[in-house]
Amino acid sequence: MLVPPPLAFDILHEIEQKLPGFPIVLHGSSSVPMDEVNTINQYGGHLEAAIGIPEEQLREASKSAVCKINIDSDSRLAMTAAIRKHLAEHPGDFDPRQYLKPARENMKKMYIHKIVNVLGSDGKLAQC
């Protein structure tokens, strides 16, 4: 069984102490939701050993000097899962408007979840 690599919170806290206010970006910090991986695999994909950073760690990091958390793989997984599912269930569809709509909706759902429950960004736009 694969174990996700832990974030180095000791290093994050050391940077915070030595460089107060210095913005930190976490690259490659997708959580790789297993429901999306399973959907992709169920509908013909072949993703092995997919693993990401646990959301609890991302939530904790968002409370530190981390100002940006990159989650592009989560976006791609959400889109790919929805497209694979749609095309498997509707094999005659060839118009991108038909299969991109559920893909956009799935990405939207993922981003709302991340903003509200993981990244600590909910309600911050009003502060800008």
Language-model features, listed with the residues they occupy:
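Metal-centered catalytic cores of metalloenzymes
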Residues: 1-128
